[in-house]
Amino acid sequence: HEMGHQFDAEHTFNSDNGGCSGNRSSNTAYEPGSGSTIMSYAGLCSPNSYAGYASGRFYHVKSFEQIVTYTTAGSGNSCPTITPTGNQPPIVDAGAGGFSIPISTPFTLPGSATEADGDSLIYSWEQYDLGNAGDWDSPSGDAPIFRVFPPVGEPTRTFPQISDVVN
């Protein structure tokens, strides 16, 4: 977490309760409640915390964007030695355009990717919406409501989790 700050990554949680009070970064608050990634305050924003969950060992895509900007265009780019890896980025297809669904309707997002070097791929589906600070259990339609999970090998994700839908 503190290393992320050294690379210009800000907090990504959206709660302003408990230990999160006064620490929310409104321009990077993409995670509901206390958040669940490295730059979150997982478990510290009572009552909006993920119970028993420590910060994941992965960054939210917004943190990744900030770190890449710092190391390629910011002051973190003042003295690098660039070493080409030869690795090709994957070609990703998460669908074109958008779609509408009725409110409170579970949905599944499919995706696919190919990688020219034959590397195995993992997938992370992340909500990328900023909004007002607030509680995840009383959504107002203008803030993130879906938490980030660690990347997996399956190229689909159901929102909310299927276990939450059937319970």
Regions found by a protein language model. Give the residues of each.
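Extracellular (secreted or membrane-anchored) zinc-dependent metallopeptidases
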Residues: 2-167
